């Protein structure tokens, strides 16, 4: 009898209610089973989830459901990264309070996530804008302050002139603010900093322990931390060219071997010498001001045009008093890196070469590539940056650059310049302290108080939390806390006199740098419960986008170490395993030069070509490239629409199935329809066979077709489990497609009443196993199928969500037959399929029965037959 069509809308709502009523996914910290903590990067509540969220959270849910089935006590929580500028922008544009806007969005997105059937422990949910959360963050801030890991200092900062706030270096992308896209400026402000540089060496060394992280991410962090071993060299200023009080310029270099190729020295616009020279020099002052208009990050420096201002000052070459080099103020040198001064060797650094060509400075090659002739070798438009041998370098000629480095260092360390060595070896890091001050309202208040008499002091713990006031105005850019009539005024906790609150709030990356620790016991008064934190951390599997490789992941690694110093956690690394998933992408469409939504077009195949037209008018539509889903290009697919049309399981199945999870997946309507057909196919096969299998005890087949069914499903159990362990979800999906194809004929026989007792037992076991294997990907369908089969696994009543992962029989997984390649006179001519345990005589006899062997022997006998056990057979004719 044909089964009634599966209705995902009804089934999914039903099972989500069952899971919620049974509190199926709530985690007990006291559970004695081995723990497994799986976490997807929590979302910013921007308004609605998108298909990228669906893919990210579907992957995490597969892992969580699988690990539960494997017997682990799984922690799989969800929260909201809820502070940030978009809420303030919405407040200004829509006249709605950031709090109201944020919590409305959270409610919408929570409903959407719940509709996906994710196995989340919602009892641990929090938003970072909850007072209860940022209260504990303020406690942490004070703890780190007392441990000397927070400091306040004046520094050059990246200023976003649109968002009117400071940006960390990592938040400046190609010289622009990561949110606003505005060109970033430099300003000098007094800021609060986390001393991440105290952990530079630890953060670098720790990368070697993260063997379950993508190498690409580790490399990005290694480069960002930027450890370099170099030489700090003192260049004496040429007499008569320098202002009073200045006698030298100290330069940090990682290439002292190239000193004989030096063409100039460049100093930062903020170098004391530059500041002194700018006094009364309008042209230099103007140039310095121009330098301040660009960002302070290395990315900003790399993308900006390289410019310099010749100061007229000269320095003496460290190895030749008669050799003088010009000193430039340059826009590509930062005071905060090294010493704020560099020497330029144009032949072997592209930036220096571009600069030298622009200002017509001499280019002298000092490293000769292997195989080149020193007399004819020259530098064109591209600097030579590889290895070789030293030339044009006097006493260094013939050495390798490495040997030359050490020779230069050794000589200059022994050379006296005004009572000190002319050079010292030095280790530098590119990483700088993390400036966390933000001039905005919607963030965690920094719990510090400024008093004219007592200085800056923490808010007493008894007075925490420092709550954000609700009565603020967003009638203009800037920080409303600065303009609040009463909030900023407070009494000094030391002297009782008038004082003011810190009005800067914390960078929102602080909120996400420790949230994973809070999930371990979000009800505790302290930031963490040490026992719970030590039990659950590190996170076993973290899943999120590669775009967070530096910002969030590096800050989290710092924060774990800082929290360890403060006694809140016992681990160094927050995330044991990291997986960075690809994006969900979609074709783009244009009509009359305007972007068009896929929901508004029809695509047909005409004469072998895909043709798109507008649904309402039939007007032609241009099919464009496949790109990341974005509102601006209107190639967005709303998960609500997909779930309403096909169900959550179809959406989950499709985003898991179409490509390896680390690559982008192309969303197509045809792909979604194909996934939905598969959902319906599984349901039909199970539902139609269920009456025949419902009361049958599961039992593996021992012979014939029943044995074949059991072998197929047991092999799939092993393979799909291995695939999920490796996060190769698409391979697991492919195996399940294959298994359904294998089982379909036998299930149809059972539905038609044509299966014998042994086949029924094998099919009951196979169907249970199939249902349990699909459950991590399509949990609602799995529950509905098991209910149709009587709601039992191995004879026991259970929800699929609480059922164990099926156990394969090793005997059924091992092939009893093997395929041996057969060679004739050393050339492969065919294969022999034979029992795995066949002896040599049996193999030789079977080979002689093969038609292609008989033909080759032409009625004769072979000279010999060589059998390499389990590998190959060679017939010598």
Curated annotation (Swiss-Prot):
The keyword Secreted does not apply. Its EC number is 6.1.1.4. It is found in: Cytoplasm. Signal peptide: none annotated. GO terms for cellular component: cytosol. Pfam families: Anticodon_1, tRNA-synt_1, tRNA-synt_1_2, tRNA-synt_1g. Keywords: Aminoacyl-tRNA synthetase, ATP-binding, Cytoplasm, Ligase, Nucleotide-binding, Protein biosynthesis. GO terms for biological process: leucyl-tRNA aminoacylation. Gene3D superfamilies: 2.20.28.290, 3.10.20.590, HUPs (3.40.50.620), Isoleucyl-tRNA Synthetase, Domain 1 (1.10.730.10), Valyl/Leucyl/Isoleucyl-tRNA synthetase, editing domain (3.90.740.10). It comes from Brucella abortus biovar 1 (strain 9-941). It is an enzyme of class 6 (ligase). This is Leucine--tRNA ligase. ATP binds at residue 631. Its main location: cytoplasm. A motif ('KMSKS' region) lies at residues 628-632. Belongs to the class-I aminoacyl-tRNA synthetase family. A motif ('HIGH' region) lies at residues 43-53.
């Amino acid at each position: 009898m044909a089964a009634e069509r599966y209705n995902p809308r009804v089934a999914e709502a039903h099972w989500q209610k069952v899971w919620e009523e049974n509190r199926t996914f709530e985690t007990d910290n006291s559970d004695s089973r081995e723990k497994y903590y799986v976490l997807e990067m929590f979302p910013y509540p921007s308004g609605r989830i998108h298909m990228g969220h669906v893919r990210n959270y579907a992957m995490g849910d597969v892992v969580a459901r699988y690990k539960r089935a494997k017997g682990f006590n799984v922690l799989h929580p969800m929260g909201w990264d809820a502070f940030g500028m978009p809420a303030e922008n919405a407040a200004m544009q829509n006249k709605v309070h950031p709090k109201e806007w944020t919590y409305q969005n959270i409610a919408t997105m929570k409903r959407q996530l719940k509709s996906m059937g994710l196995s989340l422990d919602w009892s641990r949910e929090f938003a970072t804008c909850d007072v209860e959360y940022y209260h504990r963050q303020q406690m942490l801030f004070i703890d780190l302050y007392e441990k000397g890991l927070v400091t306040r200092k004046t520094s050059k900062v990246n200023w976003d002139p649109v968002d009117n706030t400071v940006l960390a270096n990592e938040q400046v992308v190609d010289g622009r603010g990561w949110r606003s896209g505005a060109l970033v400026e430099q300003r000098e402000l007094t800021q609060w900093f986390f001393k991440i540089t105290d952990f530079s060496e630890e953060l670098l060394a720790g990368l070697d322990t993260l063997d379950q992280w993508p190498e690409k991410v580790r490399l990005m962090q290694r480069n960002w931390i930027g450890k370099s071993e170099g030489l700090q060299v003192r260049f004496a200023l040429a007499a008569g060219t320098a202002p009073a009080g200045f006698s030298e310029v100290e330069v940090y270099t990682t290439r002292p071997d190239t000193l004989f190729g030096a063409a100039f020295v460049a100093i930062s616009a903020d170098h004391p010498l530059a500041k002194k020279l700018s006094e009364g020099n309008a042209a230099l002052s103007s140039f310095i001001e121009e330098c301040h208009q660009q960002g302070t990050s290395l990315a900003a420096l790399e993308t900006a045009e390289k410019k310099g201002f010749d100061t007229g000052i000269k320095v003496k070459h460290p190895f030749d008093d008669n050799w003088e080099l010009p000193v430039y103020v340059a826009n590509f040198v930062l005071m905060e890196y090294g010493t704020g001064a560099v020497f330029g060797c144009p032949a072997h650094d592209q930036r220096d070469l571009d600069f030298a060509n622009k200002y017509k400075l001499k280019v002298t090659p000092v490293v000769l590539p292997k195989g080149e002739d020193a007399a004819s070798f020259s530098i064109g438009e591209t600097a030579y940056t590889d290895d070789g041998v030293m030339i044009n370098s006097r006493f260094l000629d013939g050495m390798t650059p490495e040997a030359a480095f050490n020779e230069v260092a050794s000589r200059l360390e022994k050379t006296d310049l005004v009572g000190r060595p002319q050079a010292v070896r030095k280790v530098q890091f590119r990483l700088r302290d993390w400036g966390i001050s933000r001039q905005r309202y919607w963030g965690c208040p920094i719990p510090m108080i400024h008093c004219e008499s007592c200085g800056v002091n923490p808010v007493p713990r008894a007075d925490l939390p420092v709550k954000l006031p609700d009565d603020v105005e967003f009638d203009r850019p800037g920080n409303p806390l600065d303009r609040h009539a009463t909030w900023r005024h407070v009494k000094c906790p030391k002297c009782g006199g008038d004082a003011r609150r810190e009005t800067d709030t914390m960078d929102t990356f602080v909120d996400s740098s420790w949230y994973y620790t809070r999930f371990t016991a979000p009800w505790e008064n302290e930031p963490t419960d040490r026992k719970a934190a030590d039990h659950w951390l590190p996170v076993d599997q973290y899943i999120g986008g590669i775009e967070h490789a530096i910002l969030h992941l590096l800050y989290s690694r710092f924060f774990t170490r800082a929290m360890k110093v403060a006694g809140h956690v016992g681990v160094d690394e927050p995330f044991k395993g990291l997986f960075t998933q690809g994006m969900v992408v979609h074709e783009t469409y244009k009509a009359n030069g305007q972007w068009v939504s896929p929901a508004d077009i029809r695509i047909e195949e005409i004469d072998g070509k895909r043709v798109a037209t507008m649904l309402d008018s039939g007007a032609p539509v241009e099919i464009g490239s496949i790109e990341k889903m974005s509102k601006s290009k209107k190639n967005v697919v709303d998960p609500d629409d997909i779930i309403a049309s096909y169900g959550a399981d179809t959406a989950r199945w499709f985003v898991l199935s179409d490509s390896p999870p680390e690559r982008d997946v192309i969303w197509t309507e045809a792909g979604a329809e194909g996934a939905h057909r598969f959902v319906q196919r599984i349901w039909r096969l199970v539902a139609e066979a269920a009456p025949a299998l419902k009361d049958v005890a599961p039992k593996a087949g021992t012979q014939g077709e029943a044995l074949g069914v059991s072998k197929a499903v047991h092999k799939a159990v092993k393979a799909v489990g291995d695939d999920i362990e490796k996060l190769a979800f698409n391979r697991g999906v492919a195996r399940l497609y294959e298994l359904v194809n294998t089982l379909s004929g036998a299930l149809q026989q059972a539905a038609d009443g044509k299966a014998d007792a042994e086949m029924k037992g094998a099919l009951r076991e196979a169907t249970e196993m199939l249902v349990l294997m699909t459950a991590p990907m399509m949990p609602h369908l799995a529950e509905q199928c098991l209910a149709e089969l009587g709601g039992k696994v191995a004879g026991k009543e259970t929800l699929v969500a609480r059922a164990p992962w099926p156990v394969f029989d090793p005997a059924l997984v091992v092939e009893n037959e093997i395929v041996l390649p057969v060679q004739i006179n050393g050339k492969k001519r065919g294969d022999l399929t034979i029992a795995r345990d066949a002896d040599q005589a049996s193999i030789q006899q079977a080979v002689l029965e093969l038609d292609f062997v008989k033909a080759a022997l032409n009625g004769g006998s072979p000279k010999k037959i060589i059998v390499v056990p389990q590998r190959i057979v060679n017939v010598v004719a």
